[in-house]
């Protein structure tokens, strides 16, 4: 049986004190009722109320949709980052992380300018003689903004795992006659699955927490 490296001990102590302990305290406090008695009556009341169940269901559905959108767009973006070289790779990484560098107020105002009734999209719709779209103050607008913020987490997670893939393995599969789709499905995707799963977990937890 392998022993735990002593170098991990400070990290584990830090996580226990500043992460695990507060979560445990919050859990214990959530069991305390108005009269000070502990029990699960509060949880029974919440999960027995249709309103709270609807809120929880909408939150989980929103998180799933945002995570799926991030996966569909973030995987190709992460693949491009992993395969890029030289100065183009640096530029591409900068473009990917830009949403995380912009202040939330500036970012929100930017989306209002783009998606609002007088924004660029609706201005183009009016110019084409098409009806105006309702893109803000609804699920769609929030989802678009959330995907914009969380996409870097997905792309960088995928790119990080693809960086570990030896391209000679893909080349060997092609030399043996495997078509590009088969190479991706049997070689590239399994290697990047860990990064994809990590990105999905990050996007899902952050999206439901923000929503």
Describe these PLM feature segments.
Residues 38-47:
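A short amphipathic helical element positioned immediately N-terminal to and/or at the very start
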Residues 131, 178-180:
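Short coil/turn motifs that cap or connect alpha-helices
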Residues 165-169:
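Short glycine/proline-centered loop/turn elements that form peptide/ligand docking sites
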Residues 183-184:
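Conserved acidic donor-binding loop of glycosyltransferase catalytic domains
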Residues 173:
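The alpha-helix within a helix-turn-helix
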Residues 2-34, 50-163, 187-211:
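Membrane-water interface segments at the C-terminal ends of transmembrane alpha-helices
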Residues 176-177, 190:
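Glycine/proline-centered hinge or cleavage motifs at structural transition points of membrane proteins
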């Amino acid at each position: 049986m392998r022993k735990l490296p002593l170098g991990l001990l400070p990290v584990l102590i830090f996580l226990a004190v500043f992460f695990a302990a507060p979560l445990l305290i919050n859990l214990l406090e959530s069991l305390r009722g108005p009269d000070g008695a502990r029990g699960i009556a509060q949880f029974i009341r919440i999960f027995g109320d249709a309103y709270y169940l609807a809120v929880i269901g909408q939150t989980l559905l929103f998180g799933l949709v945002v995570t799926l959108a991030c996966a569909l767009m973030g995987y190709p973006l992460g693949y491009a980052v992993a395969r890029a070289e030289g100065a183009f790779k640096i530029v591409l990484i900068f473009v990917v992380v830009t949403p995380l560098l912009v202040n939330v107020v500036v970012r929100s105002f930017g989306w209002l300018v783009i998606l609002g009734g007088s924004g660029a999209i609706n201005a183009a719709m009016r110019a084409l003689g098409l009806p105006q779209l309702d893109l803000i103050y609804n699920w769609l607008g929030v989802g678009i903004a959330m995907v914009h913020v969380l996409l870097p987490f997905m792309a960088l997670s995928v790119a990080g795992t693809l960086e570990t893939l030896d391209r000679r393995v893909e080349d060997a599969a092609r030399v043996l006659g495997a078509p590009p789709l088969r190479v991706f499905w049997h070689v590239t995707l399994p290697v990047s699955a860990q990064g994809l799963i990590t990105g999905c977990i990050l996007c899902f937890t952050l999206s439901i927490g923000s929503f």
